[in-house]
A protein has these predicted regions:
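C-terminal lobe and adjacent flexible extensions of AdoMet/dcAdoMet transferase-like proteins
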Residues: 208-263
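Conserved SAM/SAH-binding beta-strand->alpha-helix loop
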Residues: 98-100
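Conserved SAM-binding strand-loop segment of SAM-dependent methyltransferases
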Residues: 112-125
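A short acidic, Gly/Pro-enriched loop at the edge of an enzyme's catalytic core
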Residues: 64, 125-136
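Conserved alpha-helix/loop element of class I SAM-dependent methyltransferases that forms part
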Residues: 29-67, 71, 78-85
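Short alpha-helix
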Residues: 193-209
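A short glycine-rich, Lys/Arg-flanked "PGG" loop and its adjoining helix->strand segment in the class I
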Residues: 87, 150-165
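Short, glycine-/aromatic-enriched active-site segment of Class I SAM-dependent methyltransferases
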Residues: 172-192
Length: 263
């Protein structure tokens, strides 16, 4: 699929989610992927749903006064969690390419009275952020959606300060998917067909200039979560995939949390 077409369909898919709040991560699932009940208690209502695959904030070792940049910030959940840690002396910037998500995040920001959070409309391949801005970059199940992941990591490197940290959660492949799944629009929006092999993902981060790159956590999604997810059901219906075969695909996918440093 062409890069422009991919971005268009992802933007449209996530715009629909922003309007309906119909995402895969119910409160029960959010806790399964790393968000605690205590954390969720302190975010605005409407931000407490996630399209992610982990909690990058939990592993980012944020410090008071730091500037955090979230790539693909959605409704703002991770931004608000980060803001609670860095405090009023810190700053959090969320970037998302979907206008409806930016509107949703800004609304949530107003509801939560956050003075240290801002949301910017833009693409993660061309961040509307100055060089050497962030102490920490986080991202949650977004980079797999980009058709130009190499460029994303180069932009992350550019916008980080020297010594800045990268802490991202994302979906990677442990084995190649069938061509029919790779070409599926629903599978792309569902963070599946855009994913690359784990070794390739790490290689792209290192190629951008990051050092000390390591996978700090690797998990499989619960099979019942994948098979019963509304997006997964749409993929199964589109490609006429029975539940048993879908479970085999689930074994090809992992959620990883990756750490790196800008030297």
């Amino acid at each position: 699929m062409e890069e422009g077409k991919i971005k268009k369909m992802v933007r449209e898919g996530y715009a629909k989610i922003a309007k309906t709040e119909n995402c895969c991560c119910s409160p029960k699932v959010i806790k399964k992927i790393g968000y605690s009940k205590k954390e969720l208690k302190f975010v605005p209502k409407g931000a407490d749903f996630s399209l992610g695959c982990g909690n990058p904030v939990a592993l980012a070792s944020l410090k008071e006064g730091e500037t955090v940049l979230d790539l693909g910030s959605g409704a703002g959940l991770d931004c608000f969690l980060a803001a609670n840690i860095v405090g009023e002396k810190g700053n959090v910037i969320g970037v998302d390419m979907t206008p409806e998500m930016i509107d949703k995040a800004r609304e949530n920001c107003r509801k939560g009275n956050y003075n240290n959070v801002e949301f910017r409309l833009g693409e993660i391949e061309n961040l509307p952020v100055a060089d050497n801005t962030a102490d920490v970059i986080i991202s949650n199940c977004v980079i797999n959606l980009s058709p130009n992941k190499r460029r994303v990591f180069e932009e992350a490197f550019r916008t980080l300060k020297l010594g800045g940290r990268l802490m991202i959660s994302d979906i990677v492949l442990l084995q190649e998917l069938p061509e029919s799944v790779k070409k599926s629009v629903q599978a792309y929006i569902g963070c599946l067909s855009g994913a690359v092999m784990k070794d390739k993902y790490i290689e792209l981060i290192k190629d951008a200039g990051f050092q000390d790159v390591k996978i700090v956590e690797e998990t499989r999604f619960p099979i019942d979560f994948i098979v019963n997810d509304s997006t997964a059901k749409a993929i199964m219906k589109e490609l006429n995939i029975p539940a048993k075969k879908a479970k085999n695909f689930a074994n090809s996918v992992a959620s990883i949390k990756v750490y790196g440093v800008k030297p």
